[in-house]
Structures are given as structure tokens and as C-alpha cells.
């Protein structure tokens, strides 16, 4: 699997999670939308939460095999909350979205590790990021089967 393929697969799976859909969250693979574009999209849709799947680190686990390299991977899912969402009473927050993502993805093959939350007070934006670990066979994106 390629890095892009992993991001797209995770984004597609999360876009089917009922709780995220119900609360108007839209999940994007990092290669499809920058974080700033995701935030702009969230703000434009009357205070929704944008969710961006990123893969900041891959580390080779073993020597190559015929299909690629066994690789340990960090997978992060950033849930970006627009200021309008924060002001809604009993609204679904970035932290709620990150917890939902943690429960949706945690499995035998994807290990949930942590949730971190940060706030940009100047812009009023809150980001909660769920981090996971997994191992995949990293394939060459220029070689299509």
C-alpha cells in the first residue's frame, strides 16, 4: 500500500462513521486538502468539524520483501473545530470527533495511542488529534499493479 492509498482508505472509512456524518464532519486525506483548506471548508459550512488524515512518519521495520518494505507507521487524524462550532451549546467538539475516530479505527491492525488537543486562541480554532500506530507493506507509488 502507498502512503496516499493508506490516507485515502482511512478517510473513506471515517466518512462512513455514523456519528461523524451525523454531526457534519467531513474527512479528507492529507493529499486531497491542506489543513488550512480543511479549516476554511469547516468555517464555510457554518461551523462544522474538518477531519484530516495525515501520516507524518514511516519507519522501515525489516528488509524489503517482494512487494515492498514492511514499515511501522504513525497515523494521525486531526479534527479541526471552527470557532462557530465551539459556541454551539452542547455542540459536537473536536475532542468528541477525535474520541469517535479513536473508537472507530482502533482494531487488531491499527493501535490507538493517544489524543492531543491544542488551541489557537488568536483564531479560536481547536484541534484534537488522535494518533495510531500500524504496520503496512509500503509499496512504490510509481509501480502500479
Regions found by a protein language model. Give the residues of each.
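Short, solvent-exposed secondary-structure capping/transition elements
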Residues: 61-63, 85-89
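Acidic-leaning, charged glycine-interspersed low-complexity segments
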Residues: 20-22, 47-49, 91-145
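Hydrophobic transmembrane alpha-helix bundles
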Residues: 56-72, 142-145
